[in-house]
Amino acid sequence: MLTVALPKGALLKDSVARFAAAGLDFSAITAADNRQLMLPSACGRARALLVRNGDVPVYVAYGQAQLGVVGYDVLKEQQRTVAQLLDLGFGGCRMAVAVKESSPYRRASDLPAHCRVASKFTSSAQEFFNQLDLPVELIHLTGSVELGPITGISEAIVDLVATGRTLRDNGLIAIEDLFHSTARLIGNPLALRLDTGELNELVQAMEGQGVTP
């Protein structure tokens, strides 16, 4: 049976809608009273796993799900062995460097060498600062990274920014973008190679709704 890993949270409803448009109805998974983490599609020929956004590439890479939907930010950070099939176009946000609005820094290159930068996305942040040839001390936080500059644990943060409201409400300002992130359809490479047509048909059905990365 085809298994699809769907992300909890902000990407879920749009993910379910995209699969529904392609012929797989997983809408029961979004019901307010649903507590099941694995549900069959309405037609019974597929099932969905409801997992955390960061776990989607893990289930797909290890073959427990043949397809999945996940933000590009997670893909870039984890570098799992999965196939990027489609840019689904929703869930748009940007990975950005942010500092206190009162600070003198207005570009990432303005930051002093060996300063502290807090982030959930330390691999992406390290790659970015390496490209700038700017040595920094990265501090891995798992939530509320905005507190970094506020408390003084870091001079800057690297985090996802959608509307920018959270930054503004906490006296921070984004000074440089690393990359833009949207939801991506990913697949297990082995499952795609062994596909007898079912996966390809589903991807093609979704292709008109997205953009090939």
Swiss-Prot record:
Record's signal peptide: none
Compartments reported by the entry: Cytoplasm
Keywords: Amino-acid biosynthesis, ATP-binding, Cytoplasm, Glycosyltransferase, Histidine biosynthesis, Nucleotide-binding, Transferase
Documented EC number(s): 2.4.2.17
Family per record: Belongs to the ATP phosphoribosyltransferase family. Short subfamily.
Entry remark concerning the domains of this protein: Lacks the C-terminal regulatory region which is replaced by HisZ.
Protein name: ATP phosphoribosyltransferase
Organism: Synechococcus sp. (strain RCC307)
